[in-house]
Regions:
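Short terminal alpha-helical segments
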Residues: 1-38, 105-116
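Non-transmembrane, amphipathic alpha-helical segments
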Residues: 3-9, 13, 41-45, 67, ...
């Protein structure tokens, strides 16, 4: 993530993700595609996940006052579409949230286990783990916002990760 952040790119990614969210939440794939895939497409879109959408929604909401009116309209449309899909497919949507949170925490556990044998390497490749943890936090906050019961196993994994 050495590229410079832009609201426009973040908004484009959000729109692509939300436009594919309906099909994604009903499917089996955990790390989906936001469109434009293929070897020759030059697609640099991040994976489509509920957590990735939630992170962009929150980040762009915090930056709303820096958007021009067209960007604000596009953002509002994405917020509305996301809310509609999350409500219409609630069971599928929350199922994906849970699966993603566990998957990301499991990946982090593996990372920390590998770090114990090579701390120098760990310091050099920590950035993806920060993103994983950020997305897990977005999922956790969304669970609270929709009053979704949080499993004890998830709480334990989260606590274990944070104690590393």
């Amino acid at each position: 993530m050495s590229e410079t952040y832009t609201i426009e790119r973040d908004l484009n990614e959000l729109e692509a993700m939300v436009n594919n969210l309906d099909t994604y939440v009903r499917g089996e794939t955990l790390y989906g595609n936001a469109g434009g895939s293929g070897f020759f497409s030059g697609n640099k879109m991040p994976s489509l996940t509920v957590g990735a959408v939630l992170m962009r929604l929150r980040r762009l909401d915090m930056l709303r006052d820096q958007m021009d009116s067209k960007q604000q309209q596009r953002f509002g449309a994405s917020v509305d579409k996301h809310a509609h899909i999350a409500g219409e497919w609630r069971v599928h949507y929350t199922g994906k949230m849970n699966r993603e949170a566990h998957s990301r925490l499991d990946a982090m556990r593996t990372f920390f286990e590998e770090c114990s044998s090579d701390p120098k390497l760990c310091a050099n490749v920590y950035r993806p783990e920060m993103l994983r943890r950020t997305i897990v936090q977005e999922i956790r906050m969304a669970m609270d916002e929709i009053n979704l019961e949080v499993e004890d196993e998830f709480k334990q994994k989260l606590s274990g990760t944070d104690s590393q």
